[in-house]
Structures are given as C-alpha cells and as structure tokens.
Amino acid sequence: MDRAVSQVALENDEREAKNTWRLVFRIAILLLTVVTLAISAAALAYSMEASTPSDLIGIPTAISRAEEKITSALGSNQDVVDRIYKQVALESPLALLNTESTIMNAITSLSYQINGAANSSGCGAPIHDPDYIGGIGKELIVDDASDVTSFYPSAFQEHLNFIPAPTTGSGCTRIPSFDMSATHYCYTHNVILSGCRDHSHSHQYLALGVLRTSATGRVFFSTLHSINLDDTQNRKSCSVSATPLGCDMLCSKVTETEEEDYNSAVPTSMVHGRLGFDGQYHEKDLDVTTLFEDWVANYPGVGGGSFIDNRVWFPVYGGLKPNSPSDTAQEGKYVIYKRYNDTCPDEQDYQIRMAKSSYKPGRFGGKRVQQAILSIKVSTSLGEDPVLTVPPNTVTLMGAEGRVLTVGTSHFLYQRGSSYFSPALLYPMTVSNKTATLHSPYTFDAFTRPGSVPCQASARCPNSCVTGVYTDPYPLVFYRNHTLRGVFGTMLDDKQARLNPVSAVFDSISRSRITRVSSSSTKAAYTTSTCFKVVKTNKTYCLSIAEISNTLFGEFRIVPLLVEILKDDGVREARAGRLSQLREGWKDDIVSPIFCDAKNQTEYRRELESYAASWP
C-alpha cells in the first residue's frame, strides 16, 4: 500500500518538475522574442532616421507649407488658363461675330441695291478698309476696373480734311451732321453765301465716303460721292444717316425765321432725301399736314440719325399747337434733373413751377417746345411709312436739337442743353413696332455747355431758357454688362460765351486731361463726335467735327479734329470734381494753334463774347 502511494507521489513530483521547466522555457523564449523585437525596432529606427514623437509635431506645419506652394503654383497657372479661356471663349468668337456683322451689313446693303436695281438705285456698295472691320459702331473700350478719366485724347492729328471750307470772307458753312455705319460714312452741312444769319437761301453739301488707311498707317476719310444741292429749295437743320442704300437725309424747308415759324399755324415743310451709291440724289416731300398735324414748327435735330430694324431714325423737335391732342397729352408733365453734389436751393414747389414753365419759353410765343423721334422705312421709295414718336415730358426736357446713336446693341438719344440743364444728356432708347421709348438719361456733369444767365454752364435750378449749343457726346467706355461708363466729346469750356473748345473723356462727374484746340478766346459753336477703332493696330480714334471761327475765309470753318485715345496707367482712383478741376500734376495738352490766336485784350474779348453768344 505504502509502496503504491510512494510510486504515485514520485510520478507527481516528476510531472510538476516537467511543468516548471516548461514554464521557464516559455518565459525565456518570450523574453528573448521581446528583446529581439526591441533590438530590431531600434536598429530599424536608427537605420531609417525615423522621427521621434517630438519630431511629429512639425508635420502639420510642413503639410501647410506644401499646400501653400501647390496653391501658389496653381494660382500662377490660373492666369494662363484665364487668358486662354478669354481668348478662346470670348475674344475669338467676338472677333468672328464682328467680322460676320460687317459681312452681313455689306450683304444687306448689296441686297437692297439688287432689289432696287430696276428703279435705278445704283450698285457697287462701298466699304471701309479691312483694318476697320469690327471697329465701327461697337463698344470700343470695355473696362470694369480702370478709372474712365484715365483715358484721354492725344494732341490733334494731321489727316486729310474731307470737309469743304468757305472760299470768301462772307461765305459761311455751318450745322455739320455726321453718321458712320459698318460700311460707309455720311456727312452734310449748310452753305450760306452772304453771312451765317441769312435764312432766305442756302445750299446743302452732302457727301458719302469710307475710311481708308494710308501706306504709312494713317487714318483718312475718303469721299467717294458728293453733291451740292444748289437749287431754289432752302433746306435747313438737316440730319444725315448712313443706311444700306446710301446717305439718307431729313431736312426742313424754311422761308422764315424760327420765331416767325413758331407763330405760324401750319407745320414746317420737310423732305426725305438720299444720296445713292451711284452718286445720284433724290428726295421726296413728307406729308407734314398729317404727320405733324399737331405742330406749328418742326425741325430735324441736326445730329446724325441711325439705321435700326430696317428703318432710319431721326431726332426731331419743334412747337406744338396749343390745345392740340399732342399738347394736351403733355400738360402738367415735367422732369427735373439735378447737378452732381450741387443742389438747387429753391423751394420744391417753386422748382416744379419753373420746370413746367421751361417747356413754354417766351421766345417762341409760349408754344410748348417738344422732343420727338421720326422713323422712316428704308426702301427704294423715299418717305415710306413715316412714324412719329412723341416721348413724355416726364423723361425729356424741353425739345431741342439732338442725335440718335447706335453703339453695339444699345441705342441713345442725345438732347442739346437748350433748357436750364447744362450737362450733356444721353437717353437710352429702345425701339419696337416702329416707335421709340426713351428712358432716364445718363448725365455727364463736367461736360457742360455755355449759356445765358440764369442757364449758364454752372446753373443748377430749373428756369425757362432757350440757350446752349449743340455738342454731342459719343459713348466710349462700357462695363462688361454693356452699361455705359464714359463718353468722348468736344465741349465749349466757358460759362456763358461760345468760346474755348476742348476735347476730353468724361465720366458721370468729372473729365480727363484735355486737348485744347487753341487759346481760351477761340470762338466756336457746334461739335459732333464719333469714335472708331483700327482693329489691326487696336488703336481707338475719335473724330470731332467742330465749327471754329477766327479765320480769314468765312465766319465759321468746319474742321474735322482727329485724336487717338490714350491711357494713363498711373491713374487708378476715380475722382469727382467740377469741370474746372483737373488732377494734381496734370497739364492740358495744348497743341500749336491751328488758327490765328485772338488778342486777349479786354475790349476785344468783350466784343468776341457778345458776338459768340448771339448765334442760334
């Protein structure tokens, strides 16, 4: 029994001894494995120079720096991408569109002539040099960022004078009208043989031409056809427009003074004429007794017309018959436009009363002087389907000379500041169903005209006046959304007298540096301006056709003043200012006088100012 127990105990001791050594072995193996792993990790870390926990703190910073470098690189490439996109998606299609537009205009012109061949309307439509394709009647400067007045006119450039001048001391050329389409330009002025005040008889010069580029790259206007209408008809206040059939012209036939015409009981005779591409001129009297049955006096606006939707649109103004339907429709209507940062101090009720009275000046016997627009269908038949639009006087001021312009897809009506408001006005115009609608105008506070007191250049309150002078602005600078930003023009920089013509670029409140025609005592009158681009060189030019006096031959000489539009890249911030203020450091660009300087003697200047203020 004892022996058996001993045997069992011995076996148990042996089993326990085996288990103990097995455990020791396992622990030793485990420790060895851990030590091996630790040594391996240390060796690996040492060989790869791995970061310690303190080193890992800088990883986010390093990532941020790398991100900035990548972003910067992408940003620099974005400029290239943007330029490529602009060229491919914007500029190239626009250039193609401009080319297509010019081709279509030429085709349209030819189709008009082909359709009218049986009526001897002529053939062989002219067209400007290819350098001008896409540069006429377009938005020439599209810039959202630059200050408008950082664009400014160069000194006047010598070019071919396409306008005939008087040849005797008593001769007079006055009232220029100009319009240019994508294919040709049209120009007209009045010629009086015995002084500018004669209303009994005159000639009318009418010309058709194209823009050319000389071998040396200079711009010049080439007259292809011209005619001097020297007959028994006394055409006055003519407006001209370039249409697909040639040069359409609207004139009044006058045999009495303007005051006598307003006191008459019947409308003024009017004629629609055309100088065709074959050099032949034809005209037709309009039925004014029906078209202007509510009018006692009616005149074209002098400024150019515009070809829109197969019709030619002319500015018109004149006097309404008292108590006629057109006169009654305007009763009590008025509008007051205000100067920039220069409020009229008069009581509001008094301003309203004076604004209403401004439409019926005493000079014309208290007749309502009304603005209007006449559209005529362009066909081989003259005077076809005329339609008269009379805009409400809640938009327009007292009727006055004007101009209809088309730039890009936008249409405008310029209205001369014959009433109390001195700054230049451009009314946006939309057309539909043969009629026009005018909208609240763009105003250019530094683009003023001289006028008699109380409607001088600095006037700020409504008053009854018939004053001012025709000096139209041309839309030049646009936002990318086609909103007008700035205009070019030649103004008479004097408060009361028609003196000191200067050219400049204008925004709504200020003007650029100026280019002066001559001395401040130089007498001048009407100016009309048109801008275009030589696409080949990407240079923008503006033409101001101006009536300038102080010459040996004739009381007035009509001169085409040509400038290039330059840019002062150092000017970035727009500044408001009165018309007499210029930017610090700027100097007027005064070219060598192209006419004789007047002696600036006190008595001479007094006589000159009185003489200059006497013109209509």
Swiss-Prot record:
Keywords (alphabetical) are: Disulfide bond, Glycoprotein, Hemagglutinin, Host cell membrane, Host membrane, Host-virus interaction, Hydrolase, Membrane, Signal-anchor, Transmembrane, Transmembrane helix, Viral attachment to host cell, Viral envelope protein, Virion, Virus entry into host cell
Q: Where in the cell is it found?
A: Virion membrane; Host cell membrane
Which cysteines share a disulfide bond? C172-C196, C186-C247, C238-C251, C344-C461, C455-C465, C531-C542
Which stretches face the Virion surface side?
Answer: 48-616
GO terms under cellular component: host cell plasma membrane; membrane; viral envelope; virion membrane
Instruction: Please list the reactions this protein catalyses.
Output: Hydrolysis of alpha-(2->3)-, alpha-(2->6)-, alpha-(2->8)- glycosidic linkages of terminal sialic acid residues in oligosaccharides, glycoproteins, glycolipids, colominic acid and synthetic substrates
Instruction: Give the membrane topology, semicolon-separated if more than one.
Output: Single-pass type II membrane protein
> What broad class describes the main subcellular location of this protein?
virion
Glycan attachment sites: N119, N341, N433, N481, N538, N600
The entry assigns this protein to a family as follows: Belongs to the paramyxoviruses hemagglutinin-neuraminidase family.
Read off the domain note: The C-terminus (head domain) is involved in binding the cellular receptor.
Tell me what this protein is called. Answer: Hemagglutinin-neuraminidase
Which lineage ranks, top first, belong to the organism behind this chain?
A: Viruses, Riboviria, Orthornavirae, Negarnaviricota, Haploviricotina
Which gene is transcribed and translated to give this protein?
HN
